[in-house]
Amino acid sequence: MEFNVKSGSPEKQRSACIIVGVFEPRRLSPIAEQLDKISDGYISALLRRGELEGKVGQSLLLHHVPNVLSERVLLIGCGKERELDERQYKQIIQKTINTLNETGSMEAVCFLTELHVKGRNNYWKVRQAVETAKDCLYTFDQLKSNKTELRRPLRKMVFNVPTRRELPSGERAIAHGLAIASGIKACKDLANMPPNICNAAYLASQARQLADSSANVSTRVIGEEQMKELNMNAYLAVGQGSQNESLMSIIEYKGNQDPESRPIVLVGKGLTFDSGGISIKPADGMDEMKYDMCGAATVYGVMRVVAELQLPINVIGVLAGCENMPGGKAYRPGDILTTMSGQTVEVLNTDAEGRLVLCDTLTYVERFEPELVIDIATLTGACMVALGHHYSGLMSNHNPLAHELMNASEQAGDRAWRLPLGEEFYEQIESNFADLANTGGRLGGAITAGCFLARFASKYNWAHLDIAGTAWRSGKAKGATGRPVSLLSQFLLNRAGLNSDE
C-alpha cells in the first residue's frame, strides 16, 4: 500500500474518496464545514436528519456530493471534540481503513490528520495513521491453503497537512511509520509461526537473511558446543529436554563508524515453545506458548527498522533461541546450575526458564562493552495480573534509561509502566542451597523476576521489559501484536537524534 502527504483544500481533490470527521453531537470538523459550505449545506442537512451522530465508530459514505470533485465523501465519527485523544484517534483511523476496504475504494485522501489530538503534532498523527493502517491490513495466511483476497483492496492513501511548510515533517513521518510498520509485521510474522517450523534454527535463519539483505548488518550464531565452552550452563539446561538445538543468534548493525561509539544491545527471550518442562503447564492454552519467543521476535523486528532507516548508531540484537520440553534429559526442580557469571541458581520451577536463558545471555553481552542493554521477554504471568494487556512492565537499574524508555513509550503510544526493584524483593529469591533461586513465590512475581535478572546486569546500564501481557492477544482475534517494536524504535530514533521534534 502506498502512502503520500500533501497540502490542499478538500473541494479540489480528485479522488475516489475523501475522508473528513464529524464530532458529537452532529458537529462538523473544520474541513467538513468547508465541504458543507461548497455543497450548499448538503452535509449538515443529512446530519440534521439524524444520519450520523458523530460517535467514535460511526461512519457515513456519501456519493456525488454537490460541487465536490471526489466521487465519494466518507464521514467518520470522532466523538466529542475536546475528548479526542490518541486512543480514539487510532480507533478512528482503524474504522476508516476498514470502511474503505468494505466499500472497495482503492485510493483516498484523508483529512483526519488535521484533527486536534491532545498534545500531538502533525508528525505524530501522520506516523500513527500509517502504523495503524498497516496494522489493520495485516493478515497471517502463509499456512492457509485458501487465501481470501479483497476484491478491490485499498492501494493508496494520501494524508493532508494544513500547510506546505509541514510537508517535510509529514514525509518524514511516513518514512518512519512505514519502517516501523515493516518491523512490526516482521515481528508478528515470526511470532505467529507455529513451533514445528519456528525453532531456534529458524530464528537463526531469519537473522542470517537480514544480514544478507541489509547494509551494515552482520550475523553470527552461537551453538550448544560454544555455549558449553562459555559455561552458559543455565541457558543449556533449559534446552536439555528438547531435540532442537539451542542457538543464540547475534545481529550486529554498525551505523556509526566511530571506534569510540559503544553499541546499544537488545536481548530477546526466544523460547520458541515453552511446555513448562518437568513443571509442565496446563493443557488449556498451551498452544499459545509458541508466543514465548515474542521478545526475540521484537528484537528481530527492531533490527529490521534500524537497518531500513540506516540510523547513525550501533545496535546489537541477540535472539536467545531455545525450547523448554519435558523428557529424560530435561532439567529438574531441585537442580543447582552454575551460570556463566559464576553465580549458582537453585531451580525451584522449570517453568521459570526464561530468566535462566536470559541470565547467561546478559552475562555474554558484557563483551560488547555496551552503552546500555535492554532485555525484552514474555517473562511472567504476574505482569499480566499487575498491568493487564495494556502496559508492558519496565524495570531498570538506571533511572535516566528508565525515563528515556518511558518517554519513548508515551511518544509511540506503546505504553509501559515502571515497577520497582526494591531490596525487599531480592530477599524473596534467596536460596538455602545456592546463591539465588529461580522463583520468588507468587507475590510480586514480575518484580522478583526482574530482580533475578538485575543480579546479572550489574556491569552496565540495563532495563527489562516484561511483555507477557502485551505481546499477543488470545480469543477470536488471537495473534501477535508486534509490541513493543514501536516503543523501542522510538527509543532508538530519539537516540539517533531523529525524534518528532526534529
From Swiss-Prot:
Keywords: Aminopeptidase, Cytoplasm, Hydrolase, Manganese, Metal-binding, Protease. It is found in: Cytoplasm. Mn(2+) 1 binds at D274, D351, E353. The keyword Hydrolase applies. Its cofactor is Mn(2+). It catalyses: Release of an N-terminal amino acid, Xaa-|-Yaa-, in which Xaa is preferably Leu, but may be other amino acids including Pro although not Arg or Lys, and Yaa may be Pro. Amino acid amides and methyl esters are also readily hydrolyzed, but rates on arylamides are exceedingly low; Release of an N-terminal amino acid, preferentially leucine, but not glutamic or aspartic acids. It comes from the Bacteria. Its EC number is 3.4.11.1, 3.4.11.10. NCBIfam families: PRK00913.1-1, PRK00913.1-4. Presumably involved in the processing and regular turnover of intracellular proteins. Catalyzes the removal of unsubstituted N-terminal amino acids from various peptides. HAMAP family: Cytosol_peptidase_M17 (MF_00181). PANTHER family: CYTOSOL AMINOPEPTIDASE, LEUCINE AMINOPEPTIDASE-RELATED. This is Probable cytosol aminopeptidase. It comes from Proteus mirabilis (strain HI4320).
